[in-house]
From Swiss-Prot:
<feature type="binding site">
    <location>
        <position position="11"/>
    </location>
    <ligand>
        <name>[4Fe-4S] cluster 1</name>
    </ligand>
</feature>
<dbReference type="GO" id="GO:0009055">
    <property type="term" value="F:electron transfer activity"/>
</dbReference>
<feature type="domain" description="4Fe-4S ferredoxin-type 2">
    <location>
        <begin position="39"/>
        <end position="68"/>
    </location>
</feature>
<keyword id="KW-0560">Oxidoreductase</keyword>
<feature type="binding site">
    <location>
        <position position="14"/>
    </location>
    <ligand>
        <name>[4Fe-4S] cluster 1</name>
    </ligand>
</feature>
<keyword id="KW-0004">4Fe-4S</keyword>
<dbReference type="GO" id="GO:0051539">
    <property type="term" value="F:4 iron, 4 sulfur cluster binding"/>
</dbReference>
<keyword id="KW-0408">Iron</keyword>
<comment type="function">
    <text>Apoprotein for the two 4Fe-4S centers FA and FB of photosystem I (PSI); essential for photochemical activity. FB is the terminal electron acceptor of PSI, donating electrons to ferredoxin. The C-terminus interacts with PsaA/B/D and helps assemble the protein into the PSI complex. Required for binding of PsaD and PsaE to PSI. PSI is a plastocyanin/cytochrome c6-ferredoxin oxidoreductase, converting photonic excitation into a charge separation, which transfers an electron from the donor P700 chlorophyll pair to the spectroscopically characterized acceptors A0, A1, FX, FA and FB in turn.</text>
</comment>
<keyword id="KW-0249">Electron transport</keyword>
<keyword id="KW-0793">Thylakoid</keyword>
<keyword id="KW-0472">Membrane</keyword>
<keyword id="KW-0813">Transport</keyword>
<keyword id="KW-0602">Photosynthesis</keyword>
<dbReference type="GO" id="GO:0009773">
    <property type="term" value="P:photosynthetic electron transport in photosystem I"/>
</dbReference>
<feature type="binding site">
    <location>
        <position position="48"/>
    </location>
    <ligand>
        <name>[4Fe-4S] cluster 2</name>
    </ligand>
</feature>
<keyword id="KW-0411">Iron-sulfur</keyword>
Length: 81
């Protein structure tokens, strides 16, 4: 089952999510929108196992990263009945 990893622009570029990911789904890329000048990116979502360690590791109060598991992806996008 595929999962969707969504990175929000509230990311502070701390790299906690990247270090927490056991399958190297995430990486940091250059971005001018925060003081750290980088933001998390999820180029390999097909490797996501849905453990949500990245969410747990995120130090922001507004969870800059979310993992939507299988059917949850459909619901979150308003595609379910």
């Amino acid at each position: 089952m595929s999962h969707t990893v969504k990175i929000y622009d509230t990311c502070i570029g701390c790299t906690q999510c990247v270090r927490a990911c056991p399958t190297d789904v995430l990486e940091m890329v250059p971005w001018d929108g925060c003081k750290a000048q980088q933001i998390a990116s999820s180029p390999r979502t097909e490797d996501c196992v849905g453990c949500k360690r990245c969410e747990t590791a995120c130090p922001t109060d507004f969870l800059s990263i979310r993992v939507y598991l299988g059917a949850e992806t459909t619901r979150s996008m308003g595609l379910a009945y």
